[in-house]
Amino acid sequence: MLSFTAQLDRVQLDSTVRLPPFQTEADKQAMDARTREAIDVAYANVRSFHEAQKAPAKTTPSKHAAWAPGEDVMEVTTMPGVVCTRFPRAIESVGLYVPGGSAVLPSTSLMLGVPAQVAGCKTIVLATPPRSDGSIAPEVLYVADKIQATCIVCAGGAQAVGAMAYGTQSVPKVDKIVGPGNQYVTAAKMLVQNEVDALVSIDMPAGPSEVLVVADASAEPVFVASDLLSQAEHGPDSQVV
């Protein structure tokens, strides 16, 4: 990863892995209060939504040794002596790919990281490309601390996907990789999900962003522009109309 990061991102690093706590005092000072507050509000909103998804619609406190005491389990007796159950189990380890080539995306970090945190994933690996000076955006570091990420992989592209899929001496192997990226990231995700040696799943192959906004004279121009920019910032191949 070090050689690919130097070759492709033109950043020289001594290590590609950072461990918590991720924010230094300099990182904290680099974030203004309004940005911190906006991230806190977004975190609370995303968390409240995914917290509501945890429990099944109809639950019964578990009485079986296979589940934790008091765990909510949906149980249905289909016929005498036959009980079917449904109960949630978190994926053991997940890899979150957060793009960073064209924009700082703490929003992506939240959308990927909060569900993993709420679900109870034991290992959360966040991969994001470093900036030209080798640093990671303070906003992304702040989110990584909030979601209690296991580590940050300071690398992007196919090499980051490969590191999470197969594992390295410093990067934990994950069971599932989620998150958007460019065509190289998408191709890498599709390749590793079909690799027997990787034994990793992905969320989906994410294509280039595109959006069509239909607006009339009553539309608020600032809102329309914001909707367009939110997609256009994803990359040079994004299409906004």
PLM regions: where:
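Generic structural signal for well-ordered, non-membrane alpha-helical segments
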Residues: 1, 28-46, 87, 102, ...
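N-terminal Rossmann-like NAD(P)+-binding subdomain of aldehyde/semialdehyde dehydrogenases
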Residues: 1-89
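Flexible, active-site-adjacent loop/turn segments at secondary-structure boundaries
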Residues: 11, 17-20, 74, 82, ...
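A broadly conserved amphipathic alpha-helix scaffold signal in soluble, globular proteins
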Residues: 44-47, 51, 110, 114, ...
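N-terminal small/polar loop signature for handling phosphorylated ligands or for N-terminal nucleophile
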Residues: 48, 137-146, 165
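Alpha-helix capping at helix-to-loop junctions
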Residues: 48-55, 96, 118, 146, ...
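Conserved small-residue-rich beta-alpha loop and adjacent elements
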Residues: 67-142
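Conserved NAD(P)+-binding/catalytic subdomain of aldehyde/semialdehyde dehydrogenases
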Residues: 146-240
